[in-house]
Each structure stands twice: as structure tokens, then as C-alpha cells.
């Protein structure tokens, strides 16, 4: 076992040894050692003591380096150079990352990013179209007539079923003159919309028709229509 600085003085002696010379690098002081290994131990794990730091190393000869010394030294030099280049590259990338972080955290960048977000939101609002508003349709004359007729019939006879009142109201609508029905129902709808107050235009009186057996209603004499067609 010989250290690298003493290689020139013991080179001839090592070549005369009955074995194989391998190169081992100490894992503690990184000194390259020349180890003479007998041919019978080339497939074994041997213990080597470093002549520089006296550390004990376990060397697997199956993985040991048997290449010439000058090639091993050049490979070690390239390995160290590569490590230095990698470290320098990592340092440059770390500096660039720090600079980018400082730019992103600066107030100017935050303000500009918020402005961009506001512009995007405003664009979205401009693109979205509002759906058309649904207009509430005014109730028809028939609906107004049926509603008021059912209310009137139930006021006279509270025990009357809604279905029966609806059927009777429909019959009354069918037997009334069409023009009279439409005008009366329309006027009554307009009167109810005025503060929900029922004006004299929707005051009716009832009488039973003895011949046909159905109910009628007609406007009073003081209403805006004057006499009804049945008087």
C-alpha cells in the first residue's frame, strides 16, 4: 500500500509484486492509493489502510479500478470540474429565482396584476348578455269574469264546492252576450288594479232565470253601461 506522492520511488517494486495493482480513493481524505492485490483475492472484499489519514477502507475488488493512474487522475479531475460547473449552474438558477420572486412580490407587480384581473372581469361582464325580461300579461276578460263569478257564488253559498262554482261560472259566461261579458270583465279587472278597490263598475245584481235554470248577472242602472240587454 503506497500513497500517490511516493509512487515514483516504489513503482518498480510494485510492478514486481505477484498480483494486480488497483487504484483506490480514500473516502475520508480523497487520497488516491495504489494497492497491490494478489490474483487469488481479486474477487474478494479486502480491508485497506490509508497511508495518509490511517483510515480503514473496505474495498470490493470486483468494483475496484484497474485502469492506468494517469487516466484515473484525469477522470477525477473531470469529475471535480463537473461538480464545480453543476454548483455554479445551481447558484445562477437560485439567484435568478430570487430575482423573479422579488419582482413578483413588488408592489408595482401586484398593482399591475390586479389591474389586469379587473380588465378581464370587465370584459367578461361586457360579453354576458342579460336575458330578456318577461312581461307580465294582463289577465284576460274570461279569467277576470270566472274569478269574480266564483267569488260571488261562494259569498252567496259558502258550502258550494269550488268545482261546482267554477262550472256554474263557466255556464254564466257562455250564456251572457260575448260583447257584454268581455267589456264587463275588462272593466272590472282595471277597477281592481286601482288600489284593489272595487268601483261601481263591478257592482252586479243576480236574478234567477226561471225558463233556462241558470244564473245571470247584469249591471245596475247607475253603472257606466246604462241598462243591460235583458231589461
Curated annotation (Swiss-Prot):
It is found in: Nucleus. GO terms for molecular function: DNA binding; DNA-binding transcription factor activity; zinc ion binding. GO terms for biological process: plant ovule development; polarity specification of adaxial/abaxial axis. A zinc finger (C4-type) spans 26-53. Its main location: nucleus. Keywords: Developmental protein, DNA-binding, Metal-binding, Nucleus, Zinc, Zinc-finger. It comes from the Eukaryota. InterPro entries: HMG_box_dom_sf, YABBY, YABBY_C, YABBY_N. Residues 98-120, 211-231 are annotated as: Disordered. One of its GO terms (cellular component) is nucleus. Induction: Autoinduction down-regulated by SUP in adaxial region of the ovule outer integument. Negatively and spatially regulated by HLL, ANT, BELL1, NZZ/SPL and SUP. Essential for the formation and the abaxial-adaxial asymmetric growth of the ovule outer integument. Interacts with SPL/NZZ. Belongs to the YABBY family. This is Axial regulator YABBY 4. It comes from Arabidopsis thaliana.
Amino acid at each position: 500500500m503506497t500513497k500517490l506522492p511516493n509512487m515514483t520511488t516504489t513503482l518498480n517494486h510494485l510492478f514486481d509484486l505477484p498480483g494486480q495493482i488497483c487504484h483506490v480513493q480514500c473516502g475520508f481524505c480523497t487520497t488516491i492509493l495504489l494497492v497491490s492485490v494478489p490474483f487469488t483475492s481479486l474477487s474478494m472484499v479486502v480491508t485497506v489502510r490509508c497511508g495518509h489519514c490511517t483510515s480503514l477502507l473496505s474495498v470490493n475488488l470486483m468494483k475496484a479500478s484497474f485502469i492506468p493512474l494517469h487516466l484515473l487522475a484525469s477522470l477525477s479531475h473531470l469529475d471535480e470540474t463537473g461538480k464545480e460547473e453543476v454548483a455554479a449552474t445551481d447558484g445562477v438558477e437560485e439567484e435568478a429565482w430570487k430575482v423573479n420572486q422579488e419582482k413578483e412580490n413588488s408592489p408595482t407587480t401586484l398593482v399591475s396584476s390586479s389591474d389586469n384581473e379587473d380588465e378581464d372581469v370587465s370584459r367578461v361582464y361586457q360579453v354576458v348578455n342579460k336575458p330578456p325580461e318577461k312581461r307580465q300579461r294582463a289577465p284576460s276578460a274570461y279569467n277576470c269574469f270566472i274569478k269574480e263569478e266564483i267569488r260571488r257564488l261562494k259569498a252567496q253559498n259558502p258550502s258550494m264546492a269550488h268545482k261546482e262554482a267554477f262550472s256554474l261560472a263557466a255556464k254564466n259566461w257562455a250564456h251572457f252576450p260575448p260583447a257584454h261579458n268581455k267589456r264587463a270583465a275588462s272593466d272590472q279587472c282595471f277597477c281592481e288594479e286601482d288600489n284593489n278597490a272595487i268601483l261601481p263598475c263591478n257592482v252586479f245584481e243576480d236574478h234567477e232565470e226561471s225558463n233556462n235554470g241558470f244564473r245571470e248577472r247584469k249591471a245596475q242602472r247607475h253603472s257606466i253601461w246604462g241598462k243591460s240587454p235583458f231589461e
